[in-house]
């Protein structure tokens, strides 16, 4: 899909919405971490930090990818990074659920499984950016529901 360029931005709608989400994620990080720090278990801070970092990385990658149109090689790398960060955010979203809500061995085991699947998704997108959605989804279960 070709986008009409406005002010030199490759995809203004996505660049703006993801840029706003990036700002909100950065602004929301400190209050969330301060709230987590009030909990007696320090695992809350770790889990929330992982979640917030994964969200910041996704929106940063997406904002950069949708904003700049440098050249073919750079654009392909930005697209790969943008797509890889989807797996990171999904695993980052599971992390607080696994470590806080489920806690214990079950939570840790599920968290490890989810992050292993996310690493699989990252590797698939790193080496096969245009892989069919069906193949990608099966390779990265349980983290991806594209």
Can you describe what each PLM-predicted range is?
Residues 30-47, 94-110:
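Helix-coil boundary and interhelical linker segments in multi-pass alpha-helical membrane proteins
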Residues 62-75, 120-131:
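C-terminal ends of transmembrane helices
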Residues 12-13, 72-85:
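Juxtamembrane helix-capping/reentrant segments at transmembrane boundaries
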Residues 18, 62, 83:
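Divalent metal-coordination and catalytic microenvironments
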């Amino acid at each position: 899909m070709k986008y009409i360029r406005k002010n030199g931005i490759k995809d203004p709608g996505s660049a703006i919405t993801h840029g706003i989400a990036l700002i909100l994620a950065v602004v929301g990080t400190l209050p969330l971490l301060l709230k987590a720090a009030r909990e007696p278990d320090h695992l809350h801070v770790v889990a929330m930090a992982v979640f917030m970092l994964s969200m910041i990385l996704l929106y940063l990658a997406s904002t950069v990818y949708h904003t700049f149109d440098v050249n073919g090689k750079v654009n392909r790398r930005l697209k790969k990074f943008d797509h890889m960060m989807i797996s990171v955010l999904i695993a980052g979203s599971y992390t607080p659920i696994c470590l806080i809500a489920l806690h214990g061995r079950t939570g840790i085991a599920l968290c490890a499984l989810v992050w292993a699947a996310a690493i699989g998704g990252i590797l698939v997108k790193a080496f096969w950016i245009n892989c069919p959605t069906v193949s990608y989804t099966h390779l990265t279960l349980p983290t991806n529901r594209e």
